[in-house]
Amino acid sequence: MQERTLSILKPDVVERGIIGNVISYIEAAGLKVVAQRMCRLTVSQAEEFYDVHRDRPFFPELVKFMTSGPVVVQVLEGESAIAVYRDVMGATNPKEAAKGTIRADFAESIDANCVHGSDNADNAKREIMFFFGECEIFKR
């Protein structure tokens, strides 16, 4: 089934200049970038976006990291895009991620783990609408 998912290339990816490397993994998996932009999240935006984690002990550090520099937000489209992208990302902890995944090959730590991807269809829709209006998403 064709679906969409949100991808965020985190500040560590932008700072290290590996945006193109990460996008290569995404496209090699058969996913199409149908919307993309670079932005710098404010503290309030990061807190709202990651509100589901507000009560978790890592929340303050997550917000601090996600606001530490620019990010690249993308809408990806493809067959089973959510599951495919989660496979390409690899496990949250790069030490546990399979070789050949974005996190295994590029992430420096569990905190600076390169990418965010929606975990289910409802969250994908919510997360996409957080960053993009429908007129900003293009069919390819």
UniProtKB/Swiss-Prot annotation:
Give the top-level enzyme category: transferase
Query: Where is the protein found, in the record's own terms?
Result: Cytoplasm
Q: Which cofactor does it need?
A: Mg(2+)
InterPro entries reported for this sequence = NDK-like_dom, NDK-like_dom_sf, Nucleoside_diP_kinase
Q: Does the keyword Ribosomal protein apply?
A: no
Task: Give GO BP annotations, semicolon-separated.
Answer: CTP biosynthetic process; GTP biosynthetic process; UTP biosynthetic process
Keyword DNA repair included in the entry's annotation: no
Q: Which residues form a coiled coil?
A: none
Q: Name one GO molecular function term.
A: metal ion binding
Native organism:
Anaplasma phagocytophilum (strain HZ)
Quaternary structure, from the entry: Homotetramer.
**UniProt-listed SMART domains:** NDK
A GO cellular component term found in this entry reads: cytoplasm
Q: What is its EC number?
A: 2.7.4.6
Q: Any idea what this protein is called? A: Nucleoside diphosphate kinase
Role noted for this protein: Major role in the synthesis of nucleoside triphosphates other than ATP. The ATP gamma phosphate is transferred to the NDP beta phosphate via a ping-pong mechanism, using a phosphorylated active-site intermediate.
Top-rank taxon, per record = Bacteria
Which amino acids does the record list as binding ATP? 10, 58, 86, 92, 103, 113
